[in-house]
Amino acid sequence: MKLAVYGKGGIGKSTTSCNISVALAKRGKKVLQIGCDPKHDSTFTLTGFLIPTIIDTLQEKDYHYEDVWPEDVIYKGFGGVDCVEAGGPPAGAGCGGYVVGETVKLLKELNAFDEYDVILFDVLGDVVCGGFAAPLNYADYCMIVTDNGFDALFAANRIAASVREKARTHPLRLAGLIGNRTSKRDLIDKYIDSVPMPVLEILPLIEDIRVSRVKGKTMFEMAESDPSLEPVCNYYLNIADQILAGPEGVVPEDAQDRELFALLSDFYLNPTQPKTEEEELDLMMV
């Protein structure tokens, strides 16, 4: 099974991806997480350090693929999760999406794709150009990380459009949204009323999750010394269980940009006032 995780930049995709990878490993699956971001920090919370990237390794080998071995590019992370970072060109030069394609090419030549039960692509921000949309060519499911805000849902809608486009030629489905760092879901619900898609989980704003990123640890690793964090791990286990159950998923019908802008803007400009106690009693008496 191959998964691709997308979402607005800074929404918490990498932290979410690492914890989902460990949750899948906890369920007995052999997991490979591939970071598809030039920052090459996707797997930091799994390994505790910035691992060498595939592009760096290829440069050292003068792009002789036959000289690269799995141990040159695959590093072991917490919970037995294997980790790869695609890396990217120098800032302001080259195409990061091209590097993602080269990463997939190398891993295929190493037969790495056949070694794992689950491969999870953690993909750069909300960029859905051809290169960074490449993981969708291989994925069975896409998951979109969002929050209860305008910008993240706008980005989610653009990603949904990419899923729909790729699904024309690939057996790809959108597994659903993952709400992150939000205790509310009213704007998410307004969006999925217009663009029907599942919501896999809603994670509230939890300071320990933010701290885990700085520490270079997953919530599962932190919970080993602090059992009070186990309920937080359950959020990720719930997502893993849904994915392993093989959800039907959807081919989303994204909203047009102007239509979505109006829909989400209306939420802020014309908020629905909660009914007063007296109004609720009147309704009950009718």
Curated annotation (Swiss-Prot):
Pathway(s) per entry: Porphyrin-containing compound metabolism; chlorophyll biosynthesis (light-independent)
Domain of life of the organism encoding this protein: Bacteria
Keywords: 4Fe-4S, ATP-binding, Chlorophyll biosynthesis, Iron, Iron-sulfur, Magnesium, Metal-binding, Nucleotide-binding, Oxidoreductase, Photosynthesis
List of residues binding ATP: 10-15, 39, 180-181
Cofactor: [4Fe-4S] cluster
EC number(s) per entry: 1.3.7.7
Keyword Heme: no
InterPro entries: NifH/chlL_CS (IPR030655), NifH/frxC (IPR000392), P-loop_NTPase (IPR027417), Protochlorophyllide_ATP-bd (IPR005971)
One GO process term, biological-process aspect: light-independent chlorophyll biosynthetic process
Catalytic reaction list: chlorophyllide a + oxidized 2[4Fe-4S]-[ferredoxin] + 2 ADP + 2 phosphate = protochlorophyllide a + reduced 2[4Fe-4S]-[ferredoxin] + 2 ATP + 2 H2O
SUPFAM superfamilies according to UniProt: P-loop containing nucleoside triphosphate hydrolases
Binding residues annotated for [4Fe-4S] cluster, in chain numbering: 95, 129
Positions annotated to bind Mg(2+): 14
Cofactor note: Binds 1 [4Fe-4S] cluster per dimer.
Signal peptide from the UniProt entry: none
A GO molecular-function annotation: oxidoreductase activity, acting on iron-sulfur proteins as donors
Family, per entry: Belongs to the NifH/BchL/ChlL family.
Assembly, per entry: Homodimer. Protochlorophyllide reductase is composed of three subunits; ChlL, ChlN and ChlB.
Family matches, as PANTHER family: LIGHT-INDEPENDENT PROTOCHLOROPHYLLIDE REDUCTASE IRON-SULFUR ATP-BINDING PROTEIN (PTHR42864:SF2)
Protein's job: Component of the dark-operative protochlorophyllide reductase (DPOR) that uses Mg-ATP and reduced ferredoxin to reduce ring D of protochlorophyllide (Pchlide) to form chlorophyllide a (Chlide). This reaction is light-independent. The L component serves as a unique electron donor to the NB-component of the complex, and binds Mg-ATP.
Designated name of the protein: Light-independent protochlorophyllide reductase iron-sulfur ATP-binding protein
Organism classification: Bacteria, Bacillati, Cyanobacteriota, Cyanophyceae, Acaryochloridales
The encoding gene: chlL
